[in-house]
Amino acid sequence: MAAKGGREKIKLESTAGTGHFYTTTKNKKTMPEKMAIMKFDPKARKHVTYKEIKLK
């Protein structure tokens, strides 16, 4: 049997305050810090910073 994956599901939420979010995974061993990525927010219709929050 294969070992369980070391990836954790996370939620990237828009800092524009629109409530839009993306979900993705990340490896906690190689990236222990929180992610912050510029992505397109379709509600704000521009690129904004998305910050990582815990996926419930």
Swiss-Prot record:
InterPro entries: Ribosomal_bL33, Ribosomal_bL33_CS, Ribosomal_bL33_sf, Ribosomal_zn-bd. Keywords: Ribonucleoprotein, Ribosomal protein. It holds the Pfam family Ribosomal_L33. It comes from the Bacteria. GO terms for cellular component: cytosolic large ribosomal subunit. GO terms for biological process: translation. GO terms for molecular function: structural constituent of ribosome. Coiled coil: none annotated. NCBIfam families: PRK00595.1 (NF001860), rpmG_bact (TIGR01023). HAMAP family: Ribosomal_bL33. Belongs to the bacterial ribosomal protein bL33 family. This is Large ribosomal subunit protein bL33. It comes from Delftia acidovorans (strain DSM 14801 / SPH-1).
